[in-house]
UniProtKB/Swiss-Prot annotation:
Binds together with bS18 to 16S ribosomal RNA. It comes from Synechococcus elongatus (strain ATCC 33912 / PCC 7942 / FACHB-805). SUPFAM superfamilies: Ribosomal protein S6 (SSF54995). The keyword RNA-binding applies. This is Small ribosomal subunit protein bS6. GO terms for molecular function: small ribosomal subunit rRNA binding; structural constituent of ribosome.
Amino acid sequence: MKDFYYETMYILRADLTEEQVEQAIAKYQTLLTEAGAEVQDTQHRGKRRLAYLINKQREGIYVQINYTGDGSQIAPLERALRLSEEVLRFLTVKQEVRPPAPVAVEA
């Protein structure tokens, strides 16, 4: 089966400790790998102010996961994100073109 490139961004509650945030990131990465996806990159983008209140929260912790898979991994991931009380919002996007690999710059 053909693998596609996906990007999932989710927002965690701002009142979580750093340890809880790391546990949540690891939990969703494990869920993806167990479902057969290959995690390419995970970016912990930090705490940011939200444009509007979500569940009475003014700030959220943004996390982005880039991964490849055949598409069957999305439903279990989104179900877990939807049922989690620590996640405020999430969005999964299928990328049309795989982004280029980062090039090392010599100083």
